[in-house]
Amino acid sequence: NARQLMQALVRRVDKNAEHKKSKAAKAGKADVDYPQKFHLYRQTQAQRARILGSILIPFNADYSIPLRRAPDVLAACTEAWGEPQVDGPMIVTSLREIMGVVGAHEWRKKGVDVPALGDPPNNRIHPYYGVFSPVRGEYVDLVLKAPLPKACEVNGSAVDVGTGTGVLAAVLAQRWLSNITATDNDPRALECAQFNIQNLGMGKQVKVVQADLFPDSKADLIVCNPPWLPGKPTSPIERAIYDENSGMLKAYLAGLAAHLNAGGEGWLILSDLAEHLKLRTREELLGWIELAGLKVLARLDAKPKHGKAFDASDALFDARSKEMTSLWRLAAA
């Protein structure tokens, strides 16, 4: 059974990792500080992924699997990879990849309850393959609770930069803003956001458009939840986690003032985990804000509630346990 083989391989890989960790501790090599500790962690995770990706599964061109008792994965594969090439050659992919594809299909089908959008089942966001799921609720709650700028009180306009699933645009619509633009440059994210906005009945309030960051027009409120960690993503889903050279963060700050209406605000939603991992300092962030001609009006903080923040066995627990997610209210200086 392929799944049992994968589970056995996971146990073996994790057992070897624990053995190496214990051996290093006995040799006095465990006291590695950040950011080196984080880089070693990513290296270990990459090695683990490479080993777990070594179990391969054959596919026919129509996405059927020529193995006994193989499941029907046509719908899941079509969502992730596009329509099958019926007359094409047989292909091979890793079991880990296909498990991810099937898992993404289930998330897309069931959806994720977002309390900020009301009561289930009418509050569900359906993430697509390769689009980050809104499983961390604290940043969504910050957007729900932050006081809207006065400029938004009458026919206010808002932009959700890098909308992903469209969840933050939907929260803004839930707050009765009626002129919202949700932008992204990833075709999967655009399709995903469009589906969710229509499914929630918010199509008249929210327009989904393709843009690198900002749309052509100005707005009274511009929200951005960029990837939180400086680093190079190694997969599509990691683009929601890692921001190479803090490129998106810097670009948002640099262009914000020019795209705000008078009296408007920019809301930057950002975790300080990068600071605890020593990948970025608070002084650097404040310097980028000042350099962009912006000022900080206020900051709202929320403690993460996800499992890793409380898991003492996590390799980065000492940093994760101190993490705080903040909504920075910014305005032109």
Where would I find each of the regions flagged by the language model?
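SAM-dependent Rossmann-like transferase core, predominantly class I methyltransferases
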Residues: 74-171, 320-322
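A short glycine-rich, Lys/Arg-flanked "PGG" loop and its adjoining helix->strand segment in the class I
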Residues: 249-262
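Class I S-adenosyl-L-methionine
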Residues: 286-332
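Mobile active-site "lid"/loop adjacent to the S-adenosyl-L-methionine
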Residues: 187-189, 226-251
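Conserved SAM/SAH cofactor-binding pocket of Class I
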Residues: 136-224, 230-231
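Conserved beta-strand signature within the Rossmann-like core of class I S-adenosyl-L-methionine
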Residues: 263-270
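N-terminal auxiliary segments of SAM/dcSAM-dependent transferases
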Residues: 1-113
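Short, electropositive alpha-helical surface patch
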Residues: 274-292
